[in-house]
Amino acid sequence: GVQTCALPISFNPLKWGDAFTEGNSWHYTWSVFHDPQGLIDLMGGKDGFNQMMDSVFILPPIFDESYYRAVIHEIREMQIMNMGNYAHGNQPIQHMLYMYNYSGQPWKAQHWIREVMDKLYTPAPDGYCGDEDNGQTSAWYVFSAMGFYPVCPGTDEYVLGTPYFKEMKLHLENGKTVTISAPNNGDDKRYISLMTLNGKEYTKNYLTHQDLMNGATISFKMDVKPNQQRGTKEGDFPYSFSNEFKKKK
């Protein structure tokens, strides 16, 4: 009999919907919360990974809405935000900014997190950047304002961003207090020049849950220029499953 085969369908990373609910491939590519290092390896190493991350913001906010047959509000919000193909108004990509901490360029996380905080959360009628979805978008703000975020809740680590205020205090249920201090913080100072944890210099790109539960004083010295030496060693990177797997081999 006659055999037929389906022709391969061309892949469009800008196409919303279909396999990517309310998003596209540029948004969902980063959804390996437990293993960013595995994704870095698949992209040929840190340089290739960082270039792909950068490309999210370099691309214009163009899209293919053919699956939905209409411009859904998430697409429109991405256009209005005008941060390339980064779509903070929907949840799948919100952790992506923090992934520069896994690839040796934490200052880029600091840059883009502050951009989002300044531009997409404002006290104006149009100052909220999208839908809430069970509190995720506001929870992102609260964590990011403190200067860290739980990229992978299955670990005990909170990945560093950049503090938004000069001081914040967390009063924990166990009676301990976490003090987050950045006295020279300001609109023009988004980069972490120096960080100390309980008075000692701290270079890692994450804090542990135990660090916080013990009570902690976390101090930041902020700067207008990025410190491109801090947090760049692999020993400073947050957890990735691939690294644990490699240790066992």
Language model features by range: what are they?
Residues G1-L7:
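Short, small-residue-biased leader/transition segments that mark boundaries at the very start
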Residues P8-D18, G23-W30, W107-Q110, Q136:
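Gly/Pro-rich turn-and-neighbor structural signature
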Residues F11-N12, G17, T21, N50-F57, ...:
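A post-motif C-terminal structural segment
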Residues F11-W16, V32, I72-E77, G89-I93, ...:
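Short acidic (Asp/Glu) and glycine-rich catalytic loops that position anionic groups and cofactors
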Residues K15-Y28, R76-N90, G130-D131:
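Solvent-exposed loop and edge beta-strand segments that line ligand/cofactor-binding
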Residues S25-M43:
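A conserved active-site cap/scaffold subdomain adjacent to cofactor or substrate pockets
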Residues L42, F57-S66, Y86-H88, I93-K249:
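Non-catalytic C-terminal accessory modules of carbohydrate-active enzymes
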